[in-house]
Curated annotation (Swiss-Prot):
<comment type="function">
    <text>One of the components of the core complex of photosystem II (PSII), required for its stability and/or assembly. PSII is a light-driven water:plastoquinone oxidoreductase that uses light energy to abstract electrons from H(2)O, generating O(2) and a proton gradient subsequently used for ATP formation. It consists of a core antenna complex that captures photons, and an electron transfer chain that converts photonic excitation into a charge separation.</text>
</comment>
<feature type="transmembrane region" description="Helical">
    <location>
        <begin position="6"/>
        <end position="26"/>
    </location>
</feature>
<keyword id="KW-0602">Photosynthesis</keyword>
<keyword id="KW-0604">Photosystem II</keyword>
<dbReference type="GO" id="GO:0009539">
    <property type="term" value="C:photosystem II reaction center"/>
</dbReference>
<comment type="subunit">
    <text>PSII is composed of 1 copy each of membrane proteins PsbA, PsbB, PsbC, PsbD, PsbE, PsbF, PsbH, PsbI, PsbJ, PsbK, PsbL, PsbM, PsbT, PsbX, PsbY, PsbZ, Psb30/Ycf12, peripheral proteins PsbO, CyanoQ (PsbQ), PsbU, PsbV and a large number of cofactors. It forms dimeric complexes.</text>
</comment>
<keyword id="KW-1133">Transmembrane helix</keyword>
<protein>
    <recommendedName>
        <fullName>Photosystem II reaction center protein I</fullName>
    </recommendedName>
</protein>
<dbReference type="InterPro" id="IPR003686">
    <property type="entry name" value="PSII_PsbI"/>
</dbReference>
<keyword id="KW-0812">Transmembrane</keyword>
<keyword id="KW-0674">Reaction center</keyword>
<keyword id="KW-0793">Thylakoid</keyword>
<dbReference type="InterPro" id="IPR037271">
    <property type="entry name" value="PSII_PsbI_sf"/>
</dbReference>
<dbReference type="GO" id="GO:0031676">
    <property type="term" value="C:plasma membrane-derived thylakoid membrane"/>
</dbReference>
<dbReference type="GO" id="GO:0015979">
    <property type="term" value="P:photosynthesis"/>
</dbReference>
<dbReference type="Pfam" id="PF02532">
    <property type="entry name" value="PsbI"/>
</dbReference>
<keyword id="KW-0472">Membrane</keyword>
């Protein structure tokens, strides 16, 4: 039961990290100032 709970937590955290990373990486791309992304 503990392994199942740990697996669920890992999967949830993995998807949350992917969502946050995708949001942060696509956020500067929408803004006109892309110098910050290149720097």
């Amino acid at each position: 039961m503990l392994a199942l709970k740990v697996t669920v937590y890992v999967v949830v955290l993995f998807f949350v990290a992917l969502f946050v990373f995708g949001f942060l990486s696509s956020d500067p791309a929408r803004t006109p100032s892309r110098k910050d992304l290149e720097d």
